[in-house]
Amino acid sequence: MIGEHPYVKWAIRVIENYVRYGKVIEPDESVPEELFKRRAGAFVTLHKTDGSLRGCIGTYLPTKPNLALEIRDNAIAAATQDPRFPPVSPDELDDIVVHVDILSPPEPVRDISELDPKKYGVIVVKGWRRGLLLPDIEGVDTVEEQLRIAKLKAGIPEWDDDVEIYRFTVERYK
């Protein structure tokens, strides 16, 4: 697996242990100390070395006591529970690139002029439906396209503009 940043190395160790041995490992002294002190939403994204998506799962708000556990659980889910893909097999591990995104708290958007698909991710909400799109996604160059995809993910009709919109930033680690 490929990734240099310590947060990414933690995600890689988690995925390798889970995929190879079925073990959920606990964070230890090799995990950066700040991950034990911080809570935030986090996404773990897996790509093949050819750039194609292989898995992406995350949380936009913290659900665990600390970021080390948030990354751990989302790393396992990205490798094994993304409904778009079969679980990652041990044979694939050498050809997977891992990214970890740490999300800022979402803030309400009053006007779409406050959005920028390169800088901000979006969350669209209507009733119990919710769709999220991370920022700076290849091929997503306009606010309209970003909102269209987020609505699609939520199961909200593209033409329905009666939605709540939130934006967030990410710290992206590779």
Swiss-Prot record:
PROSITE patterns per record: AMMECR1
Report the domain of life of the source organism. Bacteria
| Domain spans labelled AMMECR1 | 2-174
Family matches, as InterPro entries = AMMECR1, AMMECR1_dom_sf, AMMECR1_domain, AMMECR1_N, AmmeMemoSam_A, Uncharacterised_MJ0810
Q: Which PANTHER family match?
A: AMME SYNDROME CANDIDATE GENE 1 PROTEIN, AMMECR1 HOMOLOG
User: What name has this protein been given in UniProt?
Assistant: Protein TM_1551
